[in-house]
Amino acid sequence: MAKVSLFKQDGSQAGEVTLNDSVFGIEPNESVVFDVVISQRASLRQGTHAHKNRSAVSGGGKKPWRQKGTGRARQGSTRSPQWRGGGTVFGPNPRSYAYKLPQKVRQLALKSVYSTKVTDGKLIAVDTLDFAAPKTAEFAKVISALSIERKVLVVLPNEGNEFAELSARNLENVKVTTANSASVLDIVSADKLLVVQSALTQIEEVLA
C-alpha cells in the first residue's frame, strides 16, 4: 500500500496516510491519459466560428445582367462564391467539438494520473483546510508553509469547504476543485496536488 505524508495547515507533519493501491498505485496507462486529455480539451472549445454563405451575405438579390444575349457567362447573383464579396463555400459552421469516452476509460485515466503524482512525490495530503472567513492571505500562508512554489491543484471535499475555495480563488497558479470534479486535464496541468484527507477518501470511494 502506498503511503504519503500527512501535513497540517501550518506545514508541520501530522503523520502518514495509507492510499488504496487500486487507485493511487496502478501502472499508468499513458495512451488512455492522452485520449482523455484530448477529449477534455476538445470539450473546452467554444466552436462559435462561422462563415457567411451566399444566402447570408448582404445584397446580391438582383440578377446582374440578363440571362442571354450579352456574350457573358450567365450570373444569377453578385454574391455567388466566384464573385469578390460573395459567399464562402464549405466554410466553418458553429458546432460542438465535445465527445464522450466510456466511463471506464475516464476512470482509468484518473487513476493513472493520480498514481503518477504519488510516484513522483507530487501529491501532498493535508488533514484539513479550515478558514474562519474567506482570506486570500491565509491560504497563501498554507501554500508557503507547504513549500509549494509552482502550479498546484487543490482538491477539496465535495461539500463544506466554501471558505477555502473563496480564499484560494485569487491566488496565482492555484486552482481549486472537488473530489468528484477533478479532471485529468486539471491534474496533468498542475505541478503538484494538494489534497484534503477527506477528499482522498471520497476519491477512493468512487474509483476503487
From Swiss-Prot:
Which residues lie within the region annotated Disordered?
45-89
| InterPro entries reported for this sequence | Ribosomal_uL4, Ribosomal_uL4-like, Ribosomal_uL4_dom_sf
Write out the GO cellular component annotations.
ribonucleoprotein complex; ribosome
A GO biological process of this protein is:
translation
Q: Which cysteines are joined by disulfide bonds?
A: none
Which UniProt keywords are present, listed alphabetically? Answer: Ribonucleoprotein, Ribosomal protein, RNA-binding, rRNA-binding
Q: Name one Pfam family in it.
A: Ribosomal_L4
Does the UniProt entry include the keyword Ribonucleoprotein?
yes
MF terms from GO for this chain are:
rRNA binding; structural constituent of ribosome
**Family listed:** Belongs to the universal ribosomal protein uL4 family.
Subunit-structure text? Part of the 50S ribosomal subunit.
Q: What does this protein do?
A: One of the primary rRNA binding proteins, this protein initially binds near the 5'-end of the 23S rRNA. It is important during the early stages of 50S assembly. It makes multiple contacts with different domains of the 23S rRNA in the assembled 50S subunit and ribosome. Forms part of the polypeptide exit tunnel.
Q: What is this protein called?
A: Large ribosomal subunit protein uL4
Q: From which lineage does this chain's organism come?
A: Bacteria, Bacillati, Bacillota, Bacilli, Lactobacillales
Gene name of this polypeptide: rplD
